[in-house]
């Protein structure tokens, strides 16, 4: 059985919104506040995670974001991400933008539960906050890998919103 692994970059106060500053969020770009040594360690962790993954699971916006940036890149990490099977959850997309991708439609919980039954390894979810919240609501997340950045953003989209069900 596959395992859903949520891998997120988060600030100290839990914000996941616009870490690179490319989405127009006024507090975006907090990812860039780490030093070169930390960036190298982060890149190694991300590569190791990608090498250990069987597939990626993404929401529509994350598929679009990643495809726009990764399709033209090369190197160990880019090559691995581009070659991994990808599953994009969407009610509007017919053709995902990133290569080697399949669209999952219909009931999200049912589609992801079926995917977990079909695969054996880690199914890594990058970004995709709305999708992650849906997965949490249906108790489909098996593991959280949160890379906490040493900054307080103050406002923005948080992975764990107040009043949400407990995530174990």
Model-inferred region functions:
Residues 1-168:
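Enzymes that bind and transform nitrogen-containing heteroaromatic metabolites
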């Amino acid at each position: 059985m596959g395992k859903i692994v949520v891998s997120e970059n988060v600030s100290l106060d839990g914000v996941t919104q616009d870490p690179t500053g490319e989405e127009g969020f006024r507090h975006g770009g907090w990812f860039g506040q780490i030093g070169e040594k930390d960036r190298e360690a982060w890149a190694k962790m991300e590569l190791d995670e990608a090498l250990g993954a069987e597939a990626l699971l993404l929401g529509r916006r994350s598929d679009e974001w990643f495809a726009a940036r990764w399709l033209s890149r090369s190197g160990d990490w880019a090559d691995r991400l581009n070659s991994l099977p990808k599953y994009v959850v969407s009610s509007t997309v017919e053709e995902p933008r990133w290569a080697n991708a399949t669209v999952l439609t219909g009931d999200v919980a049912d589609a992801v539960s079926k995917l977990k039954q079909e695969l054996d390894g880690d199914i890594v979810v990058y970004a995709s906050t709305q999708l992650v919240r849906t997965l949490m609501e249906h108790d489909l997340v098996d593991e959280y890998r949160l890379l906490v950045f040493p900054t307080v953003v103050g406002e923005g989209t948080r992975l764990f919103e107040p009043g949400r069900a407990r995530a174990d």
